[in-house]
From Swiss-Prot:
Its main location: nucleus. Keywords: Developmental protein, DNA-binding, Homeobox, Nucleus. Residues 1-24, 53-125, 152-176 are annotated as: Disordered. Transmembrane segments: none annotated. One of its GO terms (biological process) is regulation of transcription by RNA polymerase II. One of its GO terms (cellular component) is nucleus. The lineage of its organism: Eukaryota, Metazoa, Chordata, Craniata, Vertebrata. This is Homeobox protein engrailed-2b. One of its GO terms (molecular function) is DNA-binding transcription factor activity, RNA polymerase II-specific. Belongs to the engrailed homeobox family. Residues 1-21, 53-72, 100-116 have a biased composition (Basic and acidic residues).
Length: 261
């Protein structure tokens, strides 16, 4: 009788140990069952995409499903309970049942791993399909293009380079005005009277000589520049500043140097 009582107590202790081990197994999973860390590609092409940094809804759902399945099947391969031997060469029927349960749990964990692998493959194919669809769509400018460095108005988008102007040819240049002798004599007389034309005087000359106002204005400007260059007279303000030692931009020609030598 006493031996039977001892055997019953051993079986009860074994059952309680199995239950406690099953409760601890989800916390102490094998390193092979840990969810694989998703590697992010930090290439320039990926960073410049408009959807860079956004979490995809499909990947989040897959992670949740994987966690739920791991919780349902916490046991890992190789973590089966070894049935204790209660005698020399004999084992109880409950120990055999425990070993069968561990085998079933390992099969279920392998199936769950296969399913998760299929899900990973399907998610990769979905990702490739999305990338192909995005490539067909018109390109969306990323947010960094609209910063103040590229434009004062963020809504205007990136600046576009203005096309360079073509090199001016001889045909594009304004042709020189060929004044007649009468026109030149009249312009010289007006210049001797006053070197600067008023608007009314310029309009009257244009009507009398049959010229444009711009032609008469340019002739007077060129005439003043030639006289200033020929005489070499300095401006009164320049003379005043030179007296104070604040302005002296006089240049010495080679002829002057040779004479001084």
């Amino acid at each position: 009788m006493e031996e039977n009582d001892h055997s019953n107590r051993d079986v009860e202790r074994q059952d309680s140990g199995d239950e406690s081990n099953r409760a601890i197994l989800p916390l102490l999973q094998a390193p092979g069952n840990v969810l694989p860390h998703r590697i992010t590609n930090f290439y320039i092409d990926n960073i410049l995409r408009p959807d860079f940094g956004r979490r995809k809804e499909g990947s989040r759902r897959d992670e949740i499903n994987i966690v739920e399945r791991e919780n349902r099947c916490p046991s890992a391969p190789g973590s089966g309970q070894v049935a204790p031997v209660s005698g020399e060469g004999t084992s109880s029927p409950r120990a055999v049942n425990a070993s069968k349960k561990t085998d079933i749990s390992t099969d279920e964990s392998l199936k769950s791993r296969a399913e998760t692998g299929d899900q990973c493959l399907s998610s990769d194919s979905d990702c490739s399909q999305r990338c192909a669809a995005q490539a067909k769509q018109p390109m969306l400018w990323p947010a960094w293009v609209y910063c103040t460095r590229y434009s004062d108005r963020p809504s205007s988008g990136p600046r576009s380079r203005k096309p360079k102007k073509k090199t001016p040819t001889k045909e594009d240049k304004r042709p020189r005005t060929a004044f007649t002798a009468e026109q030149l004599q009249r312009l010289k007389n007006e210049f001797q009277n006053n070197r600067y034309l008023t608007e009314q005087r310029r309009q009257a000359l244009a009507q009398e000589l049959g010229l444009n106002e711009s032609q008469i204005k340019i002739w007077f400007q060129n005439k003043r520049a030639k006289i200033k260059k020929a005489t070499g007279n300095k401006n009164t303000l320049a003379v005043h500043l030179m007296a104070q030692g604040l302005y002296n931009h006089a240049t010495v020609t080679k002829d002057d140097k040779s004479d001084s030598d």
